[in-house]
């Protein structure tokens, strides 16, 4: 097993941990609703079992960042533009900042600067990721062995962007958790498949 396969495994474990986190949220917290509550409410200030869920989020964020650091060289032997991987690295840095320093305010609300920074960083991270998806499509569309993934990357960017818009519309509604789940799943699935591709091609 080489270094690229190791970082790819980190990338595959990350979305599994993140998804397991919010699934366990519904199991371990009777007050938590997948229909009403967003994922970030699990690690809001004062939330029940916050430290338990923090472990999942922090570990997931760090593992994903480690994968991003090796992404450029893990794709097509490092041939092509740095733009996509750099966008992913920037997104990963913001994700770590959110995990360590910027939880939502008590009750999963956005009231003071910390909660507002959570929203700003999460949205910015998501948009950087979507831009990274598009950049990888440009980089890999004509590369043998990667063209199918390139098309998947473009489709993921479009779908993720639309789901972000829908989630934003319902952000204050009673169904924000239900609407958010497809969005986060689209991102997590992309992370897993990208990591799997790096693992299989190295």
Question: Model-derived features: where do they sit?
Answer:
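Hydrophobic, aromatic-enriched alpha-helical segments typical of multi-pass transmembrane helices
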Residues: 2-31, 38, 42, 46-201
């Amino acid at each position: 097993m080489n270094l690229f396969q190791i970082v790819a495994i980190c990338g595959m474990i990350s979305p599994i941990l993140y998804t397991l986190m919010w699934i366990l949220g519904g199991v371990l917290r009777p007050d938590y609703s997948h229909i009403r509550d967003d994922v970030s409410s699990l690690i809001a200030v004062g939330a029940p079992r916050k430290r338990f869920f923090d472990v999942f989020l922090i570990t997931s964020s760090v593992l994903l960042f480690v994968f991003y650091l090796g992404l450029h060289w893990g794709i097509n032997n490092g041939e092509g533009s740095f733009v996509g991987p750099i966008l992913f690295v920037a997104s990963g840095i913001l994700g770590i900042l959110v995990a360590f320093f910027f939880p939502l305010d008590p009750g999963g609300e956005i009231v003071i600067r910390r909660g507002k920074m959570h929203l700003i960083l999460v949205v910015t991270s998501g948009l950087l990721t979507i831009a990274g998806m598009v950049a990888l499509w440009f980089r890999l569309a004509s590369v043998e062995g990667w063209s199918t993934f390139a098309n998947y990357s473009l489709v993921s960017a479009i779908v993720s962007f639309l789901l972000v818009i829908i989630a934003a519309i319902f952000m204050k509604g009673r169904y924000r958790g239900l609407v958010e789940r497809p969005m986060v799943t689209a991102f997590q699935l992309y992370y897993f498949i990208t990591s799997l591709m790096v693992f299989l091609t190295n």
